[in-house]
Curated annotation (Swiss-Prot):
Source organism of the structure: Calycanthus floridus var. glaucus
Assigned protein family: Belongs to the universal ribosomal protein uS3 family.
Location of this chain's protein in the cell: Plastid, Chloroplast
Major subcellular site: plastid
Record-given protein name: Small ribosomal subunit protein uS3c
A GO biological process held by the record: translation
Amino acid sequence: MGQKINPLGFRLGENQSHHSLWFAQPKSYCRGLQEDEKIRDCIKIYVQKNMRISSGFEGIAHIEIQKKMDLIQVIISIGFPNFLIEGGTRGIEELQMNVQKRFHSANRRLNIAITRVAKPYGQPNILAEYIARQLKNRVSFRKAMKKVIELTEQADTKGIQVQIAGRIDGKEIARVEWIREGRVPLQTIRAKIDHCSYTVRTIYGVLGIKIWIFVDEQ
């Protein structure tokens, strides 16, 4: 059987960069990873709760964490940051307070910055979240996958592959369904590939969503 490798880790240092930028001693490295996970989880939960009262679709492309001796800088890249930008600094301050409640550190300050993604439908995390919402609303998985491919045309991507695995449509036997449009050269290191894995809970069980996007070739 073919051996699969994560396309992001495969290209680190070539055309992909780390989303956590900090150094730590070997004994405290595990604690630093747990800190990052708590910060990311808290931000995602806050955005998901505010999605219900917001008219637009909110999607986090990625969260970058930079740690210094006295500062933790969090940069959130969001596709449609309506409730955070339209509310001025109030939305960002409220988010920062929520994160600080879970993250206690007397020696380091926490600073959160929001950046808008230029082409949100070229981000696999945002597209995976869109498919998850469609599946929860019992939309046909084929219709959801085709709609995602239509959305990526707005972002001028060179290729996309979408895969859904699990008990699709409530069938007794789990299976894998996928669709591809354009080129997705996973084995070419100079080809910049964005990838994400997303888990969604439906009434039939847990489904796994994977998306590969061919952005450009260097």
